[in-house]
Amino acid sequence: MTKSTMVRDLAADQTITGYFLVHEKEVRNTSSGKPYLRMELGDSSGTVEARMWDQFEAAKDVHRDDFVKVSARVEIYRNKPQLSLLQFRMAKPEEINLADFLPHTAYDVEVLFKEVLGHAEGMKNPWLKKLVLQVLSDPQIVGRYKRAPAAKVMHHAYLGGLLEHVAGLCGLAKQIATHYPELDVDLLLTAAMLHDVGKLDELCYERAVSYTTEGQLLGHIVIELETVSRAMDEIEGFPANLKTVVQHILISHHGQYEFGSPKLPMIREALVFHYLDDMDSKLAAVRAALASDSGEPEWSAYSGALGRKFLRLEEFLKEKEPPKETK
């Protein structure tokens, strides 16, 4: 069945009936102590908060990653659409088309992966080349590497987003190494290809993007440090000092302690890679905000990832009338 009501199309004062994926569900209490149901619902176009104030006993059988059919009133709360649920039920399997609920990259993942492998094959450092090709040929990794999102919310938060992010970083690494020839481009490429490999185990993404228990307890930096260290140990003769450098770039790529890195970047390439990663991530979040139909003609909707809204520059600079020619 084709889904007709999408999150991106929700507008104030609508009464809607539609199918959504449950991202979160919890029972909270109002300030007066009265319980109410709060859910985060979503589809491939985005997520929306939903609340039900009375008679939500049926919710006890609803869990994260379930599909539900809801009837609701669309309200605006803090400048964002919110659903006031009237009723809901579990959706039937034949009512659901998974493609409506899984946002995915606009690029062909096989083309992206071939592009990344091309960067790996062109590396001059034999140890780093062997390392990345070994990791990217691991049957336990390669399929998930092509499918995984890069994050739950912050950036490239859709299927294939991780690979899209990696391919973009590889291109940026080569460009910046051309401008700054003192940089070791193979180290930057290694970081680009392996810096988020821990997200394959940090995130689950069969229906909605969420965190695994391992992801919540360890985080992707710890997971990928173990994965990549194990791969280096399996390569006979891998230089110990080079192993330390790779490990440092991986654990420092978030750039600051408060963002999850246990060490600040203390190698030139580690610092550069942190900024490349941060720039690509933030621009992806800006792109997503500007691409959304919500917001105003000249302004995007508020971006939770970046804590602001963005000016639609082309619309702002558009000439309302062409300038008159002067004689």
Segments from the language model and where they lie:
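OB-fold single-stranded nucleic acid-binding module
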Residues: K25-P35, V48-R51, Q55-A99
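Structural detector for short beta-strands of small beta-barrel domains
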Residues: Q14-T30
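Divalent metal-dependent catalytic cores for phosphoryl transfer on phosphate-bearing substrates
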Residues: V153-H155, E164, Q175-D293
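Acidic, carboxylate-rich catalytic segments that either coordinate divalent cations
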Residues: E269-K327
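Acidic/His-rich, divalent-metal-binding segments that scaffold phosphate/diphosphate chemistry
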Residues: E95-L217, A240
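OB-fold nucleic-acid-binding modules
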Residues: M1-I16
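Short, acidic/hydrophobic/Gly-rich beta-strand patch recurrent on exposed beta strands
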Residues: R38-D43
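Divalent metal-coordination and catalytic microenvironments
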Residues: F20, D65, L169, L250, ...
